[in-house]
Amino acid sequence: MAKRINKIQEFLDEKDIDALLIKSKTVKKWMNTMTGSGCQVLITKEHGYLIVDGRYITEAKEKEHDLEIILHNPHLTGRNYLGTVEEILKKENCKTLGVEAYQVLVKEYQEIEKLGIEVLLLDQEIAHLRIVKEDEEIEAMKKSIAITDEIYQKVIEHIHVGMSEYEISALVQYYSIASGAQQMSFDTIVATGERTALPHGRPTSRKVKAHEPIMIDFGIQYQNYQSDMTRMCFIGEPDPKIKEIYDVVLKAQLAGLSAIKAGAKGKDVDKAARDVIEAAGYGEYFNHGLGHGLGIGEDGEGPTLNSKSETVLQEHMMMS
């Protein structure tokens, strides 16, 4: 964790920001610290603090070694964690505070401003700290992806005509947890037949029929890092029209993969795949982006691969 605290402090120095408040579970996971709702991280240019309430103090003392643990007791003081943040900011003479905009309530924002502290919304900047992965992160994700592939192979062995989408989803969940996943990366998507046209189709009681497409889209978290796999399978031979579309999508995916290289922009990769689908006459149905980053990912991850993305790809970025 010390390496990532240092990375944040280097960022604060570079941007001339006095402190950074971290509330999101994603960034707390990235820092390998406590992730509970009563655990907040405050990093200044010189120190790092883990602010916890009484529910987390015992666990914090057992697990936390790089951040100074500070207990706040809202039941005695009548104030939330911002009372402790205020004390630290005053002690270290901080005048500017970076925050994650999507995590800080309007009321909290106003409380901080009343202290005379300039509040800076730094969502993109904080995300950028994580966008290029370290070697150990990549290894964790490779393991996560390998486990995901094994789970998929186990699931498809059990799929049969008459099985419901709910049952397929239940198998995915079971084999994921049985294989060592901490949790699912996102709600599992299972769609069959005409429902495979729904990119985020949640499972229903619809039953599998022979020769029709079965779409399974799921991922797991392993050592906090996620996988994300989408696969299409069939019982028996698919309808010729469906096979044609499948082959177009596969060709587009391979074109996108070929376009991924350091120096390319996210929109270049999207275009490489989109051109294939448009040339085949299906462009109007490709009404979403090509892909997105992978990582801890609970609140989204860069780089984005869509028709507007100006993100320049770098070595050790991970994406789906």
Predicted region positions:
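Active-site neighborhoods and metal-handling regions in enzymes and metal-associated proteins
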Residues: M1-S320
